[in-house]
Each structure stands twice: as structure tokens, then as C-alpha cells.
Amino acid sequence: MAEFKEQVLDILEEVCENDIVKENLDVQLFEEGILDSFAVVSLLVEFQERLDIEVSISDFDRDEWATPNMVIKKLEEIR
């Protein structure tokens, strides 16, 4: 579990190019401008390639993926 969480946070940090995603797991990714629609596509591709978790863009709801903690929770539900 802890390893999975670290992997997700590493991917988030790389795609967002911002280490706040590891420092504050409740930061609002979209409201704070850390993540935008272009980055979401990159994020989903990275999740598929590195974690073997496929999330289609149509299944991505910004309200359910708004913080690093929420991203981890959603991916745990899917995998």
C-alpha cells in the first residue's frame, strides 16, 4: 500500500512538475492550477504505462480526482 501510494505521488509530481503534491496531499490540484486538462491526459497515460491501471478520460471526473489523496483512493478502487 505505501509503495503504491509513493508510486502514484511520484507520477503526480512528475506530470504536475510540482512537489507540493507530496507535501500537501489535500491540495486542490485543479483549483490551484497544478493540474489542467492537458496534464490529465499525460497523467492517465503514465498510470496505464507505469501502474498498469487504465482510466479512460470519460471516467475521469475532476471532482473525484481533485487532490492527491483522492487520486490515490480512486486508483486503489480501480486496480
From Swiss-Prot:
Database matches in InterPro entries: ACP-like_sf, DltC, PP-bd_ACP
Entry's localization field: Cytoplasm
A GO biological process held by the record: lipoteichoic acid biosynthetic process
Alphabetized Pfam families for the sequence: PP-binding
Annotated GO CC locations: cytoplasm
Chief localization: cytoplasm
Domain (Carrier): residue spans on this chain: 2-79
Molecular function as annotated in GO: D-alanyl carrier activity
Modified residues annotated as O-(pantetheine 4'-phosphoryl)serine in this record: S37
Pathway: Cell wall biogenesis; lipoteichoic acid biosynthesis
Alphabetical UniProt keywords: Cell wall biogenesis/degradation, Cytoplasm, Phosphopantetheine, Phosphoprotein
Xref: PROSITE patterns: CARRIER
Modification after translation: 4'-phosphopantetheine is transferred from CoA to a specific serine of apo-DCP.
The family this protein is said to belong to: Belongs to the DltC family.
Its biological purpose: Carrier protein involved in the D-alanylation of lipoteichoic acid (LTA). The loading of thioester-linked D-alanine onto DltC is catalyzed by D-alanine--D-alanyl carrier protein ligase DltA. The DltC-carried D-alanyl group is further transferred to cell membrane phosphatidylglycerol (PG) by forming an ester bond, probably catalyzed by DltD. D-alanylation of LTA plays an important role in modulating the properties of the cell wall in Gram-positive bacteria, influencing the net charge of the cell wall.
Protein name: D-alanyl carrier protein
Originating organism: Bacillus cereus (strain ATCC 14579 / DSM 31 / CCUG 7414 / JCM 2152 / NBRC 15305 / NCIMB 9373 / NCTC 2599 / NRRL B-3711)
